[in-house]
Amino acid sequence: MSQSPSVIDDILAEYQGLEMQLSDPELHNDPAAARKVGKRFSELQPIIQTHQKLEQAREDQEAASEMASEDKEFAEEAKRLEEEISELEEQLTDLLAPRDPHDGDDIVMEIKSGAGGEEAALFAGELARMYQRYAERHGFSTEILGLNETDLGGVKDMTLSIRSKQPSRDGAWSEFKFEGGVHRVQRIPVTESQGRIQTSAAGVLVYPEPDEVEDVHIDDKDIRVDVYRSSGKGGQGVNTTDSAVRITHLPTNIVVTCQKERSQIQNRARAMQVLAARLQQLKEEEAEAEAAEGRAAQIRTMDRSERIRTYNFPESRVSDHRIGYKANNLDSVLDGDLEALLAALKEADRARRLEAED
């Protein structure tokens, strides 16, 4: 399975051009431009590295084959290299395949408690901590933009920004894009005196936040801006002055909040960035109706009957209903150990995409 030389040559030329740009001190005077170039460089780097390994393996295999008739060890080496070449060709094919254009992007995640009252809010808080732990262990930075808590420390709603610390081919969107939907929990609530198992739900919405939000114009007449005092408790890393901002986009009824910054002006600017990202995603989904299915069909209702995943405490089981995934490691999952689950979701998505191409 060989790749078109012209495709590789074009990528190599672009890669070398980006490398030259990154070595230019002038570029780094513009952080946004430097980040854009760095991100594209990181997207191409695995392709170049895999191609170079493949070319070297082919050369080594050819040399070993020529010596195989004289030395048995070279025959074994030639066979091993054939297998390595096959693996590298498959890797290169995957790297060159069309990919989600947002995979390198940062994200904004909204977590809202649903059916289940205080217990649902406590569960929403556990989901938030789960995502924060996973993100921070995997080199992402997290920032709470908005937080509305209950008296018991549960989360009514939270807006969380998850960003790559360095430009990367695989950004936060590639990791978290399958988490949007309704998450259901089955357990005995701390608020339940009779010891009965109850079902509660929390909703998660994930959307990419590209470096550049294209073609999104927001008229001042289309938004309502409210200023309020945040409800974050001490230690939550959010501002508690009267500078928190809530922006409602009237045509779509989308609401975004930001209370992280110390000034109303800064919070408004950050909230407008988030709103632009939301509207960009909405525009893409309307232009491409199948996008919602392609992104694992995020469920925007809080109805606990429509769920993507169930967290069953009595049996310590996590079940993802979209792909039939089950694992009895609930405690570690809620502690942020999501590697196996996310890998299974990515592989199922890859299989669907390959099937669609056939």
From Swiss-Prot:
Modified residues (N5-methylglutamine): 236
Keywords on record: Cytoplasm, Methylation, Protein biosynthesis
SMART domains reported in the protein's UniProt record: PCRF
Alphabetical list of SUPFAM superfamilies matching this protein: Release factor (SSF75620)
S-S bridge residues: none
Pfam families with a match to the protein in the record: PCRF, RF-1
InterPro entries reported in the protein's UniProt record: PCRF, Pep_chain_release_fac_I, Pep_chain_release_fac_I_sf, Prokaryotic/Mito_RF, RF-1
Main location: cytoplasm
Family: Belongs to the prokaryotic/mitochondrial release factor family.
HAMAP family attached to this UniProt entry: Rel_fac_1
Purpose of the protein: Peptide chain release factor 1 directs the termination of translation in response to the peptide chain termination codons UAG and UAA.
Protein name, as recorded: Peptide chain release factor 1
Origin organism lineage: Bacteria, Bacillati, Actinomycetota, Actinomycetes, Mycobacteriales
Name of the coding gene: prfA
